[in-house]
Amino acid sequence: MKTIYPFMGLALCSVTAQAQEKPNFLIIQCDHLTQRVVGAYGQTQGCTLPIDEVASIGVIFSNAYVGCPLSQPSRAALWSGMMPHQTNVRSNSSEPINPRIPENVPTLGSLFSENGYEAVHFGKTHDMGSLRGFKHKEPVAKPFTDPEFPVNNDSFLDVGTCEDAVAYLSNPPEEPFICIADFQNPHNICGFVGANEGVHTDRPISGTLPELPANFNVEDWSNIPKPVQYICCSHRRMTQASHWNEENYRHYIAAFQHYTKMVSKQVDSVLNALYSTPAGKNTTVI
């Protein structure tokens, strides 16, 4: 197994080595994941044990940022290596508000596929054409129920994404590959907010509710940046939670940890599939 790099960013690279010397690459993405629940960054909730194990034998970054704090602009930046002001993908809207990445712009997928790699992508796209060069397999949603927390299509699609990635990595191609397992969760937390809009009583859960963070109560709003002061008016999820009480927010944190544990188990399945074949010994995990 090669050095492993779990982090929220990726630099484009060109590949010039001979086929037999080329390493494989596995990129695992978890939409909405924050280091505040990742054990490798000092958290103690036990939400990300497989990720923590990877980090323990690899490299982590403590000062890395996404290209934009919105899904589609961030993804377009990640796969193209260009910032949102260069791609003009500035929001989560589709065309014509946001243009697709031009065909003449190199992408991660095009660079690898043009240099002898099989480039495959499983899971969430939301990329405005920046995944060009990857063979994409759309996941099939697999509905299920959860006794404690609401689940929606985010979680249903992740079941299909996990199955597709596991099947591929369990029987990898002979040529070098770059594979992306692109999970939705813990993005299901957005659906949790919508399902608990306004004043409400939360569904009882097993275990102890997490404590609120130290910065939950703001004593002096004048010291808070303007964008943060007005974020309640800029996204529907903030409006939906605007009348929550402290216990509601503790349930929110518990739900976020729950969705993170769900996707962490799927990450574990993907890694086990990778290491079940000799290809895993020549694969860099990101």
Residue ranges and their predicted role:
Residues 2-9:
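Sec-dependent signal peptide recognition
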Residues 9-18:
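Hydrophobic h-region of N-terminal signal peptides that target proteins for export
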Residues 20-59:
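Active-site-proximal N-terminal segment of extracellular/periplasmic enzymes that hydrolyze or transfer
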Residues 27-30, 63-65, 123, 178-185, ...:
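Short beta-strand segments
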Residues 29, 50, 104, 108, ...:
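Alpha-helical packing segments of well-folded alpha/beta enzyme cores
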Residues 32-45, 171-175, 183-286:
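Active-site-proximal cap/lid insertion segments
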Residues 70-78:
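Pocket-flanking alpha-helical
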Residues 77-179, 183-205:
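Catalytic-site neighborhoods of secreted/periplasmic enzymes
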